[in-house]
Amino acid sequence: MIKTAVVILNWNGEAMLRQFLPSVIACSRLEGTEIYVADNASTDASCEVVEKEFPSVHLIRLDKNYGFADGYNYALQKIDAEYAVLLNSDVEVTEGWLQPMVDYLDTHPEAVACQPKIRAYRHRNLFEYAGASGGFIDRYGYPFCRGRVFESVEEDKGQYDEVIPVFWATGAALMIRLDVYRNVGGLDGRFFAHMEEIDLCWRLRSRGYQLVCIPSSTVYHVGGATLKKENPRKTFLNFRNNLLMLYKNLPEEELKPVMRVRTFLDYCAAVVWVLKGDFTNAKAVWNARREFFRIRSQFTANRQQNLAHTVLKTIPERYSFSLVWQAKVKGRKTFSALSH
């Protein structure tokens, strides 16, 4: 068994591999570390690029495009390691990025997963949308980060350099104990893409495991390389999967009241898009809710299993406020300004 497996999931990312794999190889020379590219049945020359240009990288060929969640699930079945790092193909890592995370997990057995600080690749002084300096969630399922609240991204001035527990760690650069990943069922493949890492992290936190952000490790993320922001497909997946995540994980006494408020908030979001003349994204919200109700029963067994294994009903990193109220109504656009 190796110590750390850095696993990059790829789909038609030939250009991204050429651009970012060199930094991963050069900066991941920690003893016991191996690098893998798991290819989701790309139709471009991705596999040939890995084999010919990066012979030190292990290539895992998947037979079809399984999406983010099952793509990683199937790839990780083929890897024997203590730690796995789920790393997006559009991430530039920095020298020594692995060491602080490995050291932390080695010395903190209560912690099962962590993420580095995520900065924006194109605006390198800013935090990056997908993970910034650690993820949190509000009462109604809205995710936010130290360094990012809705679309407002902060400049990194060292204000969030403390190692702290988080509710979720970004799937763009997620280090996790592989045995625990398997024990809790891994990523939910039915999500396909979006929200699946938050769902996984909720399962981990409710079982009493700790997740942290390690800001002394820094990477740079392009973001939006698969589905662009404001893409109706992305809107659909985000809204549908967020509802599924709530259904799977909310304590029984919270399920109905939270879902009632979410109905109101979701339709408010759709109305905002209509007022902007963006009818395709408004329709995506409607379709997401309709799809949620159509397939909800398929997740009932998962909900019962999650509740049966819950040891933390109240998770400190799941804040009791409404992020919509705090950010959209009160205008609080930074993590430190939110009323915790």
Predicted regions and their residues:
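A short, conserved alpha-helix in the catalytic core of glycosyltransferases
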Residues: 161-218
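Short aromatic/hydrophobic "clamp" motif used to bind/position activated sugar donors
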Residues: 84
